[in-house]
């Protein structure tokens, strides 16, 4: 009996040692995600799913590591889109209203300036000989450094004068985007920029970033590509709409495209921040391609390839639709698509519904200016 008890004891010890090795290798092979942030839990609380056969052999002394839980989708709150919707409608209306007033004031100022320049031209003709002698003597009294500075300023002025009105307008937009890009490199400002210069439907601040995010780029390449496209189409869009109407379309396109992005993110539960001028630029690009569909476009690095503006717009819209359907997340395809559709709608219907019916607003503004005592307009009078 003694030899029998010794044999049973030796068999039991070997069985326990062999079974204690199995769950360790099973946990490392089946559940490597344990290294991704979960703390070690006690062995009795481990799941049964991965090692049911091992439990039968080990008598329940060892269990598998629980699988990583799937994070729940963020809650969908459509009621949070009400304020962005009201802001979008109000901002768009105010943008085109302000553009109509600015265009009215600009025309008055240009007319008055042309009259004054005609008077000065007659006066300068009489004093031309005296002025030439005076400026010649003044130039000879300058040092070489002063002359170089004046020549540099003159070259910059000549370059600026050679730009089209659209390029001059876009230069200001590029400058604003460059300033914001530099601010992103300042660590102390990043929290402020994330709050106000990135659009996110899950954020507490949802309305103001709909405008400011259109002037925000974190990547240099992202900004350079967007600003190059905007520069390319600036002359065409401003010649078609005018400077003031272009600015209203650009700003409104940014807000509307952001709102479309809000709707898509809320509907799908894929909440996250976005930034960039792509929505506004897609509005401008779509407006030009809709107005001049036969225009020829090309690729910078492939000048041999050319295609019509209408086909280019169709390809871009199809690409964004594919991005939405397939769930691509590298770009905000919802914002791109929203901006493009707004540009197409404005050229087809919006220009007639909004811009051509601005006369009552202009008349009201004209009467309001004339009612202000002692406040002459840019041209000096109220008429």
Curated annotation (Swiss-Prot):
What name appears for this protein in its UniProt entry?
Answer: Presenilin-associated rhomboid-like protein A, mitochondrial
Q: What PANTHER family does this protein map onto?
A: PRESENILIN-ASSOCIATED RHOMBOID-LIKE PROTEIN A, MITOCHONDRIAL, RHOMBOID PROTEASE
Principal localisation: mitochondrion
Query: What is the organism of origin for this protein?
Result: Danio rerio
The gene name reads: parla
Q: Cross-referenced SUPFAM superfamilies, in alphabetical order? A: Rhomboid-like
Family from the record: Belongs to the peptidase S54 family.
Q: What is the lineage of its organism?
A: Eukaryota, Metazoa, Chordata, Craniata, Vertebrata
Q: Active site annotated at which positions?
A: 278, 336
Annotated membrane-spanning segments are: 84-104, 169-189, 220-240, 246-266, 272-292, 299-319, 335-355
EC number(s) on file: 3.4.21.105
> How does this chain sit within the bilayer?
Multi-pass membrane protein
Query: What would be an example GO MF term here?
Result: serine-type endopeptidase activity
| Comp. bias (Pro residues) | 66-75
Region of interest (Disordered), ranges: 35-75
Query: Which InterPro entries does the entry mention?
Result: Peptidase_S54_rhomboid_dom, Rhomboid-like_sf, Rhomboid_protease_S54
Summarize the protein's role. Required for the control of apoptosis during postnatal growth. Essential for proteolytic processing of an antiapoptotic form of opa1 which prevents the release of mitochondrial cytochrome c in response to intrinsic apoptotic signals.
């Amino acid at each position: 009996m003694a030899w029998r008890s010794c044999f049973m004891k030796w068999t039991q010890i070997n069985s326990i040692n062999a079974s204690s090795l199995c769950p360790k290798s099973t946990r490392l092979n089946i559940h490597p995600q344990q290294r991704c942030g979960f703390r070690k839990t006690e062995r009795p609380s481990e799941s049964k799913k991965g090692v049911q056969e091992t439990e039968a052999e080990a008598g329940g002394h060892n269990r598998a590591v629980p699988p990583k839980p799937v994070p729940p989708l963020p809650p969908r709150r459509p009621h949070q889109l009400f304020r962005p919707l009201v802001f979008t409608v109000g901002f768009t209306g105010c943008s085109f209203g302000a553009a109509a007033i600015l265009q009215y004031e600009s025309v008055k100022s240009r007319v008055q300036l042309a009259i004054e320049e005609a008077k000065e031209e007659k006066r300068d003709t009489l004093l031309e000989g005296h002025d030439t002698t005076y400026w010649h003597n003044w130039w000879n009294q300058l040092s070489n450094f002063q002359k170089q500075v004046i020549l540099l300023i003159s070259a910059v002025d000549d370059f600026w004068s050679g730009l089209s009105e659209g390029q001059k307008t876009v230069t200001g937009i590029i400058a604003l985007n460059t300033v914001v890009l530099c601010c992103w490199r300042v660590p102390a400002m990043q929290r402020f920029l994330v709050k106000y210069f990135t659009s996110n439907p899950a954020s507490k601040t949802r309305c103001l970033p709909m405008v400011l995010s259109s002037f925000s780029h974190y990547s240099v390449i992202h900004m350079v590509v967007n600003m190059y496209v905007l520069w390319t189409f600036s002359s065409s869009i401003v010649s078609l709409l005018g400077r003031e109407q272009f600015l209203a379309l650009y700003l409104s396109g940014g807000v509307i495209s952001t709102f479309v992005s809000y709707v898509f993110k809320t509907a799908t539960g894929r909440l996250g921040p976005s930034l960039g001028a792509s929505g506004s630029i897609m509005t401008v690009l779509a407006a030009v391609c809709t107005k001049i569909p036969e225009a020829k476009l090309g690729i910078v690095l492939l000048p041999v390839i050319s295609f019509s503006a209408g086909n280019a717009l169709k390809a871009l819209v199809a690409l964004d639709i594919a991005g939405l359907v397939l769930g691509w997340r590298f770009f905000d395809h919802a914002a791109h698509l929203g901006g493009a559709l707004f540009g197409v709608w404005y050229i087809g219907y919006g220009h007639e519904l909004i811009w051509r019916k601005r006369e009552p607003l202009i008349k009201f503004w004209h009467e309001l200016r004339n009612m202000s005592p002692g406040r002459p307009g840019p041209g000096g009078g109220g008429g």
